[in-house]
Amino acid sequence: MLARALLLCAAVALSGAANPCCSHPCQNRGVCMSVGFDQYKCDCTRTGFYGENCTTPEFLTRIKLLLKPTPNTVHYILTHFKGVWNIVNKISFLRNMIMRYVLTSRSHLIESPPTYNVHYSYKSWEAFSNLSYYTRALPPVPDDCPTPMGVKGRKELPDSKEVVKKVLLRRKFIPDPQGTNLMFAFFAQHFTHQFFKTDFERGPAFTKGKNHGVDLSHIYGESLERQHKLRLFKDGKMKYQMINGEMYPPTVKDTQVEMIYPPHVPEHLKFAVGQEVFGLVPGLMMYATIWLREHNRVCDVLKQEHPEWGDEQLFQTSRLILIGETIKIVIEDYVQHLSGYHFKLKFDPELLFNQQFQYQNRIAAEFNTLYHWHPLLPDVFQIDGQEYNYQQFIYNNSVLLEHGLTQFVESFTRQRAGRVAGGRNLPVAVEKVSKASIDQSREMKYQSFNEYRKRFLVKPYESFEELTGEKEMAAELEALYGDIDAMEFYPALLVEKPRPDAIFGETMVEAGAPFSLKGLMGNPICSPEYWKPSTFGGEVGFKIINTASIQSLICSNVKGCPFTSFSVQDTHLTKTVTINASSSHSGLDDINPTVLLKERSTEL
């Protein structure tokens, strides 16, 4: 009672008409419902807690809490004791049991069906059924609260430009200690923009990606009209062109597909792919080209296996196979690298067949915001001994043609990416993109960083110094925000102290992993009815999925089968080259890259 009275008094002191739920009084995922104008009630149903604010654990919950290790303890165990994990990885039933626990414990943190969106902070049919919205992990802060974060902090948030300049902008490039490379950085950017497709004409809370998951619309197009323009309608294949004996995407002129290119780009360099923004940087077009080649390769395999099949069945089955390949690569290569675990992750949909699991997904606005990993980007891009700055690199597909995919893969495999957590590692070229992320979070009325930590079962920070793990940035944040409980979600993710020798801090992993794994395993192809050889054209197609890796994808589609992975293998290869490239421009010297990045690709 005392705690409740104090929270209400604080709200009333700041605003006589404050919504009683502004103080976020309901804990442990309890739901706050206003009762009259100055009272509230917490719905603790199925939370495992009871009491006025859902703070008293039930008996079984109390036991679970006593036995459950902290996220950092779990991370330590999984990233140490390599010898033990090598043994576990070889014992199938143990590996399966642990992987099943990883999948269920993470994915159960995501509400399914979805619950809220920017306009509905309560359960509603509109929030459930309207696919044009991103869903929300936490409801928006009520409109009638005394401060932007509810009752904590100042009445106005700090200037977003100041936040970016003081704690986010790079002073000096900080390489990722996990050895993450640019093959990873561009894979992340390419992969996620099949479902991060904000409809900025309607606002940051809306999406054009109505499938809300891994549908490969960045390869095939979001609409049927776009897909048809990109298809060859022969043997299931996508349109392509041959340049120097190698397959590349067709041009905008040949397909009449809408793409975003500045007027300075020559027609023959305006490649057309599923995602309209992928002309932005050659790294994205590299992956677009690789997946185009893979689709057409799989079509050839299926055509040989099923000469009786027509174009449509070859196309549709190849698409399902590529979805399977993507999910396997993301879990076993991409997430495996990010985790730093010695435990070997496994893509096996059958692990969940006897579990309570819903094969549907809805992309959350917070997941989109969380995935703004711009500190990965280097200051320059090093390709085959040449150096390209941002102005030379963006909207310049001639770089891809000049060097070819083999050199791109080799060079990006060797070049180290930046560390995401720890602050002050954001490239100046994307300063405006980062500012826009903060502004859009405010427009969508995100709750505070600490509220999101509680949402994902992580203890809230008690001070800025605990958040950053140092004193200088902590003091800057203290001056900007005044209260750790008023710290914003997005900048906090980037300034949070990294885990030891890791790319991310605790919250990025604990909040990001549930969204990621639920989205991957919630795909229809992972369901019992779909996950069988016949869905993928028989054992041949099923094998393509079950043997997929980032290395096999490259070997099947890039001349010479260059070695690749998502981390730099030899630290001696990360040294900076000093040769300055002046060739391969496309008349873009007079274009400000930061303006283009802001106007055309706020999400990228």
Curated annotation (Swiss-Prot):
Glycans are attached at residues 53, 130, 396, 580. Homodimer. It comes from Bos taurus (Bovine). Heme b binds at residue 374. It catalyses: (5Z,8Z,11Z,14Z)-eicosatetraenoate + AH2 + 2 O2 = prostaglandin H2 + A + H2O; (5Z,8Z,11Z,14Z)-eicosatetraenoate + 2 O2 = prostaglandin G2; prostaglandin G2 + AH2 = prostaglandin H2 + A + H2O; (5Z,8Z,11Z,14Z,17Z)-eicosapentaenoate + 2 O2 = prostaglandin G3. This is Prostaglandin G/H synthase 2. Pathway: Lipid metabolism; prostaglandin biosynthesis. S-nitrosylation by NOS2 (iNOS) activates enzyme activity. S-nitrosylation may take place on different Cys residues in addition to Cys-526. Acetylated at Ser-565 by SPHK1. During neuroinflammation, acetylation by SPHK1 promotes neuronal secretion of specialized preresolving mediators (SPMs), especially 15-R-lipoxin A4, which results in an increase of phagocytic microglia. Residues 18-55 form the EGF-like domain. Keywords: Acetylation, Dioxygenase, Disulfide bond, Endoplasmic reticulum, Fatty acid biosynthesis, Fatty acid metabolism, Glycoprotein, Heme, Iron, Lipid biosynthesis, Lipid metabolism, Membrane, Metal-binding, Microsome, Nucleus, Oxidoreductase, Peroxidase, Prostaglandin biosynthesis, Prostaglandin metabolism, S-nitrosylation, Signal. It is a peripheral membrane protein.
